[in-house]
Amino acid sequence: PSQGKVIVVDNGSTDNSIQLLNQEYPAIELLPFSENYGFAEGYNRAIAILAKRFEYIVLLNSDVAVKPGWLTPLIAYLDANPDCAAVQPKLLSDTRRSHFEYAGAAGGFIDRNGYPYCRGRIFSVCEPDNGQYDTPADVMWASGAALTVRSSVYLSCGGLDKDFFAHMEEIDLCWRMRLAGWKLAAVPASVVYHLGGGSLPAENPRKTYLNFRNNLLMLHKNLPDSTRRSTLLRRRLLDTIAWTKYIATLDFKNAAAIWRAHRDFARMRHNYDRTTRPTVDLIKGQPNILLQFYLRGHKTFDS
């Protein structure tokens, strides 16, 4: 939109990013931080500064390529749906533009065991985009790679959890928005292309650690007492199977990452014990995608 403003948040970069921006794009507003606060706290600090100026904030990763007019359908959807807190575009892979991209595809969901999946992506299988998800849809979570959110809701729901540092923090925020009564949506009339893996490669043990630890923290925070313990017990069993697989393939670094994730979850979960516990289980009754994917061979969302 013509009234929009491009703001670059420099999260403690150590290259010549700031110099390049000042020289090549002097009209862009720059918000530099002296250190890398991570994906979560970097956005929190920026939005706390910018929220009074803007009704909507767009969280856009630096590895996302956009097309002219991509933002217009997202803003229009929020304007027309005041009960919706945040929206995402259709995310396609920047390296294989005929296919959906891992980190959001056409909108995210969470299965009964806490595993995130998407319209267009189950586990690591990304579907080709054949227009099968070209209608707007309510979703459980929207991708943080290109998230348009009401700044007031972002702040009232607590923003991204800085203890996550990176990975899955937008899913946690979306879960809290849903618990607060807000809707979330995927708006496929808007299309962007995401490179992905810009922070950490897929098989990096640090990524494995953050994904496993943060998923456990997210479940601990957002599930009611009535189902939290049983869900976490199932996850401990399933994560043990994943650990065994890494051991069997001699991938000891990723096996150690899972062990550290559970160790640190046990240490960190008490930080959330004083928060108000949810009373609604938003993933109860959702599909079991492990069963659907591995035993029944269902590799696509619509199957």
Residue ranges and their predicted role:
Residues 134-191:
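A short, conserved alpha-helix in the catalytic core of glycosyltransferases
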Residues 1-3:
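Short, acidic, metal-binding catalytic loop of nucleotide-sugar glycosyltransferases
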Residues 108-139:
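Short, flexible, basic/aromatic active-site loop/helix in glycosyltransferases
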Residues 180-274, 280-289:
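Active-site-adjacent helix/loop segment of glycosyltransferases
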Residues 10-19, 35:
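A conserved acidic beta->alpha catalytic loop
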